[in-house]
């Protein structure tokens, strides 16, 4: 059986894996400009892996850095929820008549970030997709290493599944996140599967995630490189070693979800740029998802670095539109 994959987007967002996605000539002007902007900001700054996590967090809170705090939404509220004795704080971007719930898990290497730091982005998702957004305030490493973060996110997911109709008048849920948030989303899907609780999870929006704690070639090959990346190899190692402390088996699916049994998973959309050191994580996980008979799509953005969609551009808008189309298709 010969399957011919055709390109499905005129703006160089490849929705199948093609050599053209990795050809430098297909990097758009706005991505070149974005990369130059990132390099100019980072070239004279101290390496991020040399800055303590609490300092990085405060810099972002004060509006500094490349991924700065966003103004609060008037529609946002914090609520403590729980299953049994396990309590978790969630941040809700309310919607009067949502079609579904978007369970969002923020990025930050499991060590920085917060549920209330991207209100404007989450409000836009709520408006564009007609949904209520629930973002999880999970505990951060190194103070709270693995498995604190997935335990908190699992509690939030189970609570949503059990209370979605009563609280939000809809039982449909799409889960998703960026970077560490995509990792946690995949881990939570595996945990929910083990509980037989995947029925109301309609899809997964997995944006430049990390799925193998042993690290994939695209990350490892940059060891010792002096090239400037938004997410460097040294920072990936620092995040990983701060999150997985002690004798943690990095081949476990709960640690590296790429090792999990992905049979029966909901449809997933993977998004990644070819300049991202986590590129192979998305390429490999996309293939694994399909190999287990689960539906998956992928957006590959030529030349884009980690967190590229945090910067306004024509390409970012095109990616957002593709994600919206995917989410609407799975409901």
Residue ranges and their predicted role:
Residues 1-92, 331:
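A glycine/proline-hinged amphipathic helix-loop "lid/cap" segment
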Residues 4-7, 77-82, 86-91, 95-331:
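Alpha/beta-hydrolase superfamily serine-hydrolase fold, recognizing
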């Amino acid at each position: 059986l010969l399957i011919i994959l055709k390109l499905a987007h005129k703006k160089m967002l490849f929705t199948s894996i093609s050599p053209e996605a990795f050809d430098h000539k297909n990097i758009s002007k706005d991505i070149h400009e974005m990369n130059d902007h990132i390099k100019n900001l980072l070239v004279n700054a101290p390496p991020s892996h040399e800055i303590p996590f609490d300092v990085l967090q405060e810099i972002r809170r004060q509006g500094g850095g490349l991924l700065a705090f966003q103004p609060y939404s008037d529609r946002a509220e914090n609520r403590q929820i729980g299953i049994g004795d396990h309590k978790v704080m969630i941040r809700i971007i309310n919607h009067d008549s949502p079609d579904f719930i978007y369970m969002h898990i923020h990025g930050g290497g499991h060590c920085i970030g917060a549920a209330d730091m991207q209100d404007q982005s989450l409000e836009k998702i709520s408006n564009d997709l007609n949904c209520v957004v629930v973002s999880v305030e999970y505990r951060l490493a190194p103070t709270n290493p693995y498995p604190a973060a997935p335990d908190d996110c699992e509690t939030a997911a189970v609570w949503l599944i059990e209370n979605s109709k009563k609280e939000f008048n809809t039982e449909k849920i799409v889960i998703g996140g960026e970077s560490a948030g995509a990792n946690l989303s995949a881990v939570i899907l595996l945990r929910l599967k083990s509980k037989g609780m995947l029925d109301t999870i309609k899809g997964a929006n997995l944006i430049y995630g990390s799925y193998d704690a042993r690290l994939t070639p695209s990350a490892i090959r940059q060891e010792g490189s002096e090239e400037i990346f938004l997410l460097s190899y040294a920072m990936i190692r620092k995040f990983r070693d701060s999150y997985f402390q002690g004798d943690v088996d990095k081949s476990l699916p709960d640690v590296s979800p790429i090792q999990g049994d992905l049979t029966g998973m909901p449809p997933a959309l993977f998004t990644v740029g070819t300049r991202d050191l986590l590129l192979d994580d998305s390429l490999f996980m996309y293939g694994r998802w399909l190999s287990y008979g689960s539906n998956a799509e992928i957006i590959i953005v030529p030349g884009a670095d980690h967190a590229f969609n945090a910067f306004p551009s024509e390409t970012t808008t095109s990616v957002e539109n593709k994600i919206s189309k995917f989410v609407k298709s799975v409901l």
